[in-house]
Amino acid sequence: VQEKAVTYPTDGKLYERCRQHLVRLSRRYRIKLWQNYSRKAPYLLLMANRYHSAKQMKRKRKALKQLKTLVGRVQRDIERQLQAQPEEVRSAFDETLEKTRRILGQQRQDKDKLYSFHAPEVECIAKGKAHKKYEFGVKVGITVTNKSNFVLGARSFPGNPYDGHTLESCLEQAEILSGTRAKE
């Protein structure tokens, strides 16, 4: 697994990143928001993390629900005001609004969740180890020589396929790049 530079993706962090991106974009295009919750949202995230460490899960859920509501308010405010804006401004917001909708709508058991705002290709890969159960990144196959560990090829495999199914394509790529066939 080639890990990406992402922190452990909690719901609260993703909500706060959505809010930050939306507020930053609205400032850039001079869209006046009714409220941007620049004090309340980080405070709610902090409190949710505090409640989690104190094992006060009901309070944590309440804080996260409030945070999610605030992000939804900012999103709807921007969507309302974009109707009066020119097409180029609307197109600048398309990707960010789509990611925000996706993050606000995803549930725990959903497939194809968004784990990172800046790197949407990140997947959750279960490792089966006690100390590190999950890694967030993309599965890769790296082909090296037997004696000197010289890298012949590297390839990413989106969708977390079974390792045995990736071997043939890695060897094929190494054969194409090096010009020699691998020995059995």
Annotate each predicted stretch with a short phrase.
Residues 1-184:
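Anion-binding and metal-coordination hotspots
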